Amino acid sequence: MHKLIIKYNKQLKMLNLRDGKTYTISEDERADITLKSLGEVIHLEQNNQGTWQANHTSINKVLVRKGDLDDITLQLYTEADYASFAYPSIQDTMTIGSNAYDDMVIQSLMNAIIIKDFQSIQETQYVRIVHDKNTDVYINYELQEQLTNKAYIGDHIYVEGIWLEVQADGLNVLSQNTVASSLIRLTQEMPHAQADDYNTYHRSPRIIHREPTDDIKIERPPQPIQKNNTVIWRSIIPPLVMIALTVVIFLVRPIGIYILMMIGMSTVTIVFGITTYFSEKKKYNKDVEKREKDYKAYLDNKSKEINKAIKAQRFSLNYHYPTVAEIKDIVETKAPRIYEKTSHHHDFLHYKLGIANVEKSFKLDYQEEEFNQRRDELFDDAKELYEFYTDVEQAPLINDLNHGPIAYIGARHLILEELEKMLIQLSTFHSYHDLEFLFVTREDEVETLKWARWLPHMTLRGQNIRGFVYNQRTRDQILTSIYSMIKERIQAVRERSRSNEQIIFTPQLVFVITDMSLIIDHVILEYVNQDLSEYGISLIFVEDVIESLPEHVDTIIDIKSRTEGELITKEKELVQLKFTPENIDNVDKEYIARRLANLIHVEHLKNAIPDSITFLEMYNVKEVDQLDVVNRWRQNETYKTMAVPLGVRGKDDILSLNLHEKAHGPHGLVAGTTGSGKSEIIQSYILSLAINFHPHEVAFLLIDYKGGGMANLFKDLVHLVGTITNLDGDEAMRALTSIKAELRKRQRLFGEHDVNHINQYHKLFKEGVATEPMPHLFIISDEFAELKSEQPDFMKELVSTARIGRSLGIHLILATQKPSGVVDDQIWSNSKFKLALKVQDRQDSNEILKTPDAADITLPGRAYLQVGNNEIYELFQSAWSGATYDIEGDKLEVEDKTIYMINDYGQLQAINKDLSGLEDEETKENQTELEAVIDHIESITTRLEIEEVKRPWLPPLPENVYQEDLVETDFRKLWSDDAKEVELTLGLKDVPEEQYQGPMVLQLKKAGHIALIGSPGYGRTTFLHNIIFDVARHHRPDQAHMYLFDFGTNGLMPVTDIPHVADYFTVDQEDKIAKAIRKIHDIISERKRLLSQERVVNIEQYNKETGNSIPNVFLIIDNYDTVKESPFMEEYEEMMSKVTREGLALGVYIILSGSRSSAIKSAIFTNIKTRVALYLFENNELTNIIGSYKKGVKDVKGRAAINDDNFTQFQIAQPFELAEGQTYNERIKNEVAQMKEFYVGDYPKHIPMMPDKVFMEDIREAYDLEKIIHEEHKLPLGLDFEDVELVSLDLTSSSIVTAIKPTEMEKMNDVIMSSLSVYSKNQFVILVDAEDNMSQYSEDVTSYYSAPSDLSNIRLGFKQEIEARKNGEKSIEECKIVFINNIKRFNQLTGMTEDEIRVLFNEGQKVNIIIIASGLYSDTIGAFDRESKMMVRTINQALISHKISEQEFIRVKDRFGEPELKVGEMYYINNQEYQKIKLMEG
């Protein structure tokens, strides 16, 4: 062990050096030592001799290097430089210096320092350091400015190359110079830095002191000694009586010797009786004494035996259930007893309640004395012994949490203290892997239990939160998860009950409820009200009184006071056992909790399998160049083996996965829950294959249903031939079609080369016989469970396809998070290998492996490989390719500077602003090993110019396609004099059956009319815009005319300025649309006439025969649905029917859009050959449009399907791609302007529409009025509504001008006179002003008459002039125009007869005298007098301000619903024909 002190520019650092490791010193915060402004990087390492070097320069005690701002001093200390001295025992001041009188003498120390106040260090925890101003003193590596400073226990002091550490009993010293001192040395060994695994804790073998359980039997006393009950007098009296009788007999009759014999015998009998009596009595007394002595000795031995057993029991209890003070010592010393209890031990979840007289662990057997009249004291002694050892006095009273809910009752503060003792006991002896606590308590009680937050057992690891519920937020955050956990455990028990297999749930949850109000309205209440012991959950209730407890509580503990408690019931049995709770006032509970918090419990010794291994470590390389990819590609051949490294079984023990058909392949399953490393193991496998096999031998098709995450990682990998993400119904069918197309292609190539297996083909390809590469295709689905759920048909077909394609080199790898219910028989039978990482439960493990092993995996990346029927079954650690690629090799790790606060829930909460932990200017994006390897392969591919394999899976159609990407769009290059066949490029089509994507082109001659049906907002207008621009760019304006019917929301308005557009119509322009309908009818009729004239059948033949170029006409209709609701529906549909029937041959095409096919009349829709469908809200509508189509159209704007043979889908092209900052309308205007500037020629004519007002000046600009009036002898009136052409009064015949209202009459007169004023310059014009209100025109005419006398004269003048001209007396060449203002009044004033009127109007026009008569309708046409009727009969020309249906000048067909005429509107009638006109204004 070495210590290195680095000093530079007043910065001081210390580094503990470990043998075999390397270190860096630099400005970089990721370095082991960071020194500001250092200006270089110093690498510390050992050479072969073990000498430490700085940038290859050995450090011999001190090494000084030149730095940018100061010298860099490196001082190396070894064990030999270490010493430790006690403080002086008497004085309170000591000196360290170079003088002999100093308490500690170090010759190299130039200036002495003083250590003071160490005698009180136990109380103050510090000493004082005093030095002079010339001495630099560092405390904890910070330079001190003051001359006196405090140094606390554990602080480091550095002064002039001397390192000191303050301890409670002395100073530790590091000095490269000899330290001489009279002080007591404490130790000679330098303390080592803590090992890397200092805080790890492994269980030691447990020592269990069993409580005695052997029965002890107290035998009954021996049977009492039977006492001889014979009374001595009974033995004496008979012989005495015999003697007395003998004497009586002798006195009566002396017998002699016989008497002596009788007396002798009786005497002897008496003697023997007396002796026998006393002898037996003595023996009896001895036997009684011996019986009593022997039995008491037996009882004494039994007492010793019982006492020994009791002592053993008490020792066992005290050992396994120590006091809290003893527990503190156990934790403090990190004793091996910590976490000694497991769920398999008999005393799991047992804890001490207190001290009590507890039941013996052994059975003391004693048989009571049966009924006996005589009392046997020995029975009493035995009974006394039996009763004396009824209990074990003053022993720990044990309770457990295994047998039903328990409850504490009493004062809450006392109960909380008991719960604290329980917490300490259970937490010390049970690992947090096996036991967790959840407290539902009052918020005010959390402070009492605050110390327990340090216990690792208080963290619910499944929820990553502390097990405290004390308010609404914590309740919702925790209890819902606990509810789900309980539910899952109950379900597991129900399922396992069928197999009679016991389940042990871990961790055990101790659920303490001190406040029921928090759960009373929560769903978890249904489980709290039952016994959950079977499910690994122990319930503890706390209430004030027993009446408040739930009925299912089995054990009740009453805490009466701090010194008295009572175990009322235990497991439903009444025990009423009093006990004395332990006093823990002097125990630091938080200290115990903090000590336990420091321990990281490792349940098993580290396996040979590493916890993790990076991808490059698996290949035993540091840089990607060392992978030797090119050589691997050259040497490895898939037809021999496809084995590639996937992970390690142990150190240098590589596990390979070989999907060769004869090895582990060709198909397989991967299962692993979230966070198990499932995606990572797939990534490593893909990367391993890519490293070992050429892109022409191995390729990947990724199905990432979760959204393309994995696909994005490999987007630059040359082996990747396609990705399938986010499949919907349409994409699923497309994917299947593409895969099947690939199979057909492979079968075709096999047939061409007469092989039937991929391996044979690869041999031919290596030999150069086969030229098209055909790699093994790995189809990998990262989450097929969801895919199968959403697209079951696709999944079924995919598995079936893979089964068929095994000889064609198709490999299928299916991955899922939860295999239960997903892996069916077909998938299982087709999957030879299975990879199982950590799965959610045993059922999932059994589903994939047929064993529960995978449910016990805890590490990410740890997996089982199973091949076949356990032909191979191995546990390994898969490689991780997401590790940071350290290309510089300096292994600098980014120091996370994020500051976290552990909040009240036990969760980390970042509190500093920069959550990245890095300064902005230092932020650096690190490349992963996966990215580095892919980049390396990509560079090799580029360098070797490897040709990409044809992709079986083309990417989904993009959502944005532009016309310029599909065809030439520069109209300058495309416009020509030659008439071209119309081809429309609709967009980018997708033909998975042919593995092709390209322009969707329609030859309009074959395709015919086009109907696009789609829901609003899905590209209908874009479709039309694209066609409009496509036509405009390929044909000049004189070759293509477009009529835009915009019945939607003005979507076609932006393109109206395109020079090809003849006109633009909206639905409210009824008159204009009516004109357009007539215009189209005229076009049809005219073109039919031309074809008939040339005897050809279509417009192309006509153009060819005649050399003419009749333009194609396009009727483009947006939102056809509106037609159904329009007033012009019938006329429009009639026109549409005609065009759809006859238009194709005539070069008239319809392209329409709508939202419903039903809006189009069936007769019309039937004639539309090409039908296109966008996405539709109503699915059944699709069938009506394009026929029976199973795929459907994707919900993407612009995605469409067409009714060709394959129901081809395509993405509608947009007419152009916008430049940055450019708007859509700006882009259109730019191109339109360029077209107009480039084109020289005629533009298509607009549909003429009547302006709001017709001004004389506008007429003058548009027409040559002088010519019309003087040469054509016509008088301009206004514009015709139909053609918007000039309508003029014929001045070669008389006419009448009439109106209903006088005001209208005046206006009409003004218009007539305005035109006549031009005419009068060269012609003779007479104004007869019978109304006398037009005198303002008197100067503009040749003659003006208004006086009644003048009018009478003029009547005669008319007659004479007509006669003179008829007789030839006057020339008829000179035309005289006579305008009569108010013809009725003129007749009244002049008295003209019927015949005179006939002559004036009929005969006068024959001799070039033209009468223009004006008057109100009621006075002229509507009058009933004979003169008026004569006038009407003789005139063929009229200008009437009256509805045509109501006038009587000519007869017309009934016109129902004719609108009222607006101001300035009127009818011009000539020879029974009429035109609606708008009168011009001055």
Swiss-Prot record:
The chain crosses the membrane at residues 230-252, 257-279. Residues 652-846, 997-1183 form the FtsK domain. GO terms for cellular component: plasma membrane. Residues 1-229, 280-1482 are cytoplasmic. It is a multi-pass membrane protein. InterPro entries: Firmicutes_EssC_C (IPR023839), Firmicutes_EssC_N (IPR022206), FtsK/SpoIIIE/SftA (IPR050206), FtsK_dom (IPR002543), P-loop_NTPase (IPR027417), SMAD_FHA_dom_sf (IPR008984). Its main location: membrane. It holds the Pfam family FtsK_SpoIIIE_N. GO terms for molecular function: ATP binding; DNA binding. Residues 253-256 are extracellular. It is found in: Cell membrane. Keywords: ATP-binding, Cell membrane, Membrane, Nucleotide-binding, Repeat, Transmembrane, Transmembrane helix, Virulence. SUPFAM superfamilies: P-loop containing nucleoside triphosphate hydrolases, SMAD/FHA domain. Component of the type VII secretion system (Ess). Required for the secretion of substrates including EsxA and EsxB. However, unable to support secretion of the substrate protein EsxC. Belongs to the EssC family. Homooligomer. Interacts with EsaE. This strain lacks esxB and esxC. This is Type VII secretion system protein EssC. It comes from Staphylococcus aureus (strain MRSA252).
